């Protein structure tokens, strides 16, 4: 039993060390100008690996954004519209405010602190940011362009404890190279009766 515990402990230490080194490397890549010529083939493999890991490890906390981003890995997604039925976003105060004041389709953009881990809005904000909310035929729909901006630095860490900055332009590089594929996600739920 002691041998198993020691191996488990060493495996966890190794995973933590690799994870920390990966975060440092990702931070280094994020500091470069976002231009295709700035990244070697090996750098793109590093970014792609981080992208896949980010989706796999983030899925338990952020299943919707992991779903959106993972589908970008499939060439068959390119240019498509994919509809997902889920009411996960209806509990958001931000979304409820938009529905309470709805008169026409509205583009969604949360305040910057909404993306911070621990904020009650971060799961919905990450999945639906830049989307357009509209109500039609008793349904609430949010159309989200699943594509990466060339320049956008997002802080996903815990304030005062952990600073995890993600330069989304790194994923834009993969998109430009055809390694990931943009599409439109449409999240749909029944309009709540108020």
Q: Where do the PLM segments sit?
A:
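Membrane-interface motif at the C-terminal end of an N-terminal transmembrane signal
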Residues: 18-34
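Prokaryotic Sec-type signal peptides and long signal-anchor helices
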Residues: 8, 13, 24, 30, ...
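Early compact domain cores of eukaryotic multidomain regulators
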Residues: 33, 40-49, 53-66, 70, ...
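Catalytic toxin/effector domains delivered as secreted proteins or via bacterial secretion systems
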Residues: 64-71, 76-194
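N-terminal Sec-pathway targeting helices
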Residues: 1-18
């Amino acid at each position: 039993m002691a041998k198993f515990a020691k191996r488990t402990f060493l495996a966890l230490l190794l995973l933590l060390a690799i994870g920390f080194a990966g975060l440092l490397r990702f931070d280094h890549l994020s500091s470069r100008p976002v231009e295709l010529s700035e990244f070697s083939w090996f750098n793109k493999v590093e970014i792609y690996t981080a992208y896949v890991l980010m989706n796999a490890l983030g899925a338990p906390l952020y299943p919707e954004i992991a779903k959106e981003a993972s589908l970008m890995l499939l060439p068959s997604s390119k240019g498509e519209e994919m509809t997902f039925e889920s009411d996960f976003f209806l509990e958001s105060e931000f979304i409820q405010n938009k529905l309470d004041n709805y008169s026409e389709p509205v583009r969604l953009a949360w305040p910057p602190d909404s993306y911070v881990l621990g904020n009650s809005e971060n799961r919905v904000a990450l999945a639906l940011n830049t989307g357009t909310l509209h109500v039609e035929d008793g349904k609430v729909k949010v159309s989200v362009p699943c594509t990466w901006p060339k320049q956008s630095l997002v802080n996903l860490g815990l304030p005062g404890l952990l600073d995890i900055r993600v330069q989304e332009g790194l994923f834009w590089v993969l998109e430009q190279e055809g390694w990931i594929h943009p599409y439109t996600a449409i999240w749909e739920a029944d309009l709540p009766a108020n």
